[in-house]
UniProtKB/Swiss-Prot annotation:
Described function: Major component of the type IV fimbriae that plays an essential role in twitching motility, natural transformation, and protease secretion.
Domain of life: Bacteria
Disruption phenotype: Deletion mutants do not colonize the ovine hoof. Mutants show also altered secretion of extracellular proteases and twitching motility.
Subcellular location: Fimbrium; Membrane
Propeptide: 1-7
Gene Ontology cellular component list: membrane; pilus; type II protein secretion system complex
Taxonomic source organism: Dichelobacter nodosus (strain VCS1703A)
PANTHER family, per database record: GENERAL SECRETION PATHWAY PROTEIN G, PREPILIN PEPTIDASE-DEPENDENT PROTEIN D
Membrane topology category: Single-pass membrane protein
Protein name according to UniProt: Type IV major fimbrial protein FimA
Modified sites of kind N-methylphenylalanine: F8
């Protein structure tokens, strides 16, 4: 009487390994892009938090302030896990004559890789910079000096960029 063999043949196992390899070839780059996009979004969130500081500073006719952390004042920067956001620029002298979608002269520069966990940042955006112009209506538009690739930007910034 012949015994029945159980299990997979070598060719079946090789086919499964090949299929897993093909799937990984697509999944790993997509996952790396996803990580980079989430880290860029963290920097944009930092910039959103700076909007109120810019509005307060504009009341004094400037974009930046000399904050004293010892007295409870906040400065021109916000640091996140992967990025450092800094307020820069000089307000336009003719703010009253601008339309809501015109830049007001204030900018937020986001530097990736300078956060508290900067060593763990995606290599796709490490050392990259995103510069956002604040518009009169308070929203942001991407500046042409930005080095972050457009595919990593949040949808709102992609649509706002000409």
């Amino acid at each position: 009487m012949k015994s029945l063999q159980k299990g997979f043949t070598l060719i079946e196992l090789m086919i499964v390994v090949a299929i897993i390899g093909i799937l990984a070839a697509f999944a790993i780059p997509a996952y790396n892009d996803y990580i980079a996009r989430t880290q860029v979004s963290e920097g944009v969130s930092l910039a959103d938090g700076l909007k109120i500081r810019i509005a307060d500073n504009l009341q004094d006719g400037k974009c930046t302030s000399e904050g004293d952390p010892a007295s409870g004042e906040v400065g021109n920067t916000d640091m996140g896990k992967y990025a450092l956001a800094t307020i820069e620029g000089t307000p336009d002298a003719n703010l009253a004559g601008l339309t809501p979608k015109d830049p007001n002269g204030c900018k937020v520069k986001i530097e990736y890789g300078k956060g508290t966990a900067g060593d763990n940042i995606s290599p796709l955006i490490k050392g990259q910079m995103l510069v956002l112009n604040q518009l009169v209506n308070g929203s942001y538009d991407k500046d042409s000096s930005s080095t972050v690739k457009p595919k990593f930007l949040p949808k709102a910034l992609k649509e706002a960029t000409p």
